[in-house]
């Protein structure tokens, strides 16, 4: 399972072109991160990205912006633990089909599952420029998260092709990649390169 996470600041070319190339490779989802955009800017971008994703049969995952997901009728959302706790009632009312949560401890993983998350993203597993100066949590942490819940767990943070076997050995269901997705030479080939 592969989820590609956007970050236009890492993207060396046009973000929409790159998203279209990634979507052609059919990952399990494309998560629209872009946390620094205003709500209006995010909604406008999500509208266009959703069209690209639909054309390619790839789910768009809205990151954090519950109101945009509801407004655009996008059924997949990814939340921080704080937002998962805050929006629990709204999530139930909105009827999202997939609710992901970012977790950084075993306790958070268990809580997220109790609150209704359908999958978890655990990290950061390896060193990454996105979290400079913060030590990675490592494979043992990932294994413990996987063992503590019954829902799928994806690894994030410093994931490269060279890590796939190690990550798969922890019981994880897949990976989320951002830097590689935004900078690689052949975005359409990512799914095959990160296959478990």
List each language-model region with its residue ranges.
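Hydrophobic faces of well-ordered beta-strands that scaffold small-molecule active sites
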Residues: 2-6, 30-32, 60-62, 77-79, ...
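Conserved, mostly hydrophobic/aromatic
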Residues: 4, 22, 30, 69, ...
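Glycine-rich phosphate-binding active-site loops on the catalytic face of alpha/beta enzymes
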Residues: 4, 81-90, 121-133, 161-196
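Short, acidic/polar
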Residues: 9-23, 64-67, 104-111, 160-165
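Structural motif
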Residues: 22-25, 72, 94, 115, ...
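Glycine-rich, proline-tolerant flexible connector loops at the mouths of alpha/beta enzymes
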Residues: 31-41, 124-131
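Alpha-helix-loop-beta-strand connector modules within alpha/beta enzyme cores
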Residues: 42-64, 81-84, 88-105, 133-161, ...
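Histidine/lysine/aspartate-rich catalytic loop segments that bind and position anionic ligands
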Residues: 102, 106-131
